[in-house]
């Protein structure tokens, strides 16, 4: 299945940086790349442990109604450098037209420097269902009941 996502580059964005793309035929996530403003392209962006930084992609997108774009971490960056998204998955709504930035943090012990053009996250397009929330006097009973975190055990 294919869906068209309109992409607009920011006026300052480097056109040599590829638009989001899928690395393999079966990939669910399209790679997003750092597209840094001209004044910091040479030095990159350093993220200190436990700090948060919004890394620009230089893009704006138009997601079709009925869909969202989920921004997810890249597993290799998480494993090798402790780089993750504190709000994973980040949600880009279909009516948002602002700059697409990726909120990143380092959960490791060493700073990470991201360079212009680095793959920094993945974008997954997913359908959206808007529910109707209805007040009720009671909820139907289930076998699980009110058991919350860890209540279903291990294994």
Curated annotation (Swiss-Prot):
Domain of life: Bacteria
First-level EC class: hydrolase
Similarity comment text for this entry: Belongs to the dUTPase family.
CDD domains noted in UniProt: trimeric_dUTPase
InterPro entries reported for this sequence: dUTPase, dUTPase-like, dUTPase-like_sf, dUTPase_trimeric
GO biological process: dUMP biosynthetic process; dUTP catabolic process
EC code: 3.6.1.23
Pathway connected to this protein: Pyrimidine metabolism; dUMP biosynthesis; dUMP from dCTP (dUTP route): step 2/2
Residues bound to substrate: 74-76, 87, 91-93
Swiss-Prot/TrEMBL catalytic activity: dUTP + H2O = dUMP + diphosphate + H(+)
Cofactor(s) needed by this chain: Mg(2+)
HAMAP family according to UniProt: dUTPase_bact (MF_00116)
Functional note: This enzyme is involved in nucleotide metabolism: it produces dUMP, the immediate precursor of thymidine nucleotides and it decreases the intracellular concentration of dUTP so that uracil cannot be incorporated into DNA.
Molecular function terms from GO: dUTP diphosphatase activity; magnesium ion binding
Annotated source species: Dinoroseobacter shibae (strain DSM 16493 / NCIMB 14021 / DFL 12)
Full protein name: Deoxyuridine 5'-triphosphate nucleotidohydrolase
Name of the gene: dut
UniProtKB keywords: Hydrolase, Magnesium, Metal-binding, Nucleotide metabolism
């Amino acid at each position: 299945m294919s869906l068209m996502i309109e992409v607009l580059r920011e006026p300052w964005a480097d056109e040599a940086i590829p638009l989001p793309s899928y690395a393999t035929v079966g990939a669910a996530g399209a790679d997003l790349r750092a597209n840094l403003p001209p004044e910091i392209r040479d030095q990159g962006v350093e993220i200190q442990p436990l700090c948060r930084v919004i890394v620009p992609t230089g893009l704006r997108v138009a997601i079709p109604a009925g869909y969202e774009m989920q921004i997810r971490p890249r597993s290799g960056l998480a494993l090798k450098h402790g780089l993750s998204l504190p709000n994973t998955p980040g949600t880009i709504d279909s009516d948002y037209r602002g700059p697409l930035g990726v909120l990143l943090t380092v959960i490791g012990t060493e700073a990470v420097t991201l360079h212009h053009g680095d793959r920094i996250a993945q974008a997954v397009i997913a359908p959206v269902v808007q529910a109707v929330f209805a007040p009720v006097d009671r909820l139907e009973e289930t076998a699980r009941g009110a058991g919350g975190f860890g209540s279903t055990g291990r294994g």
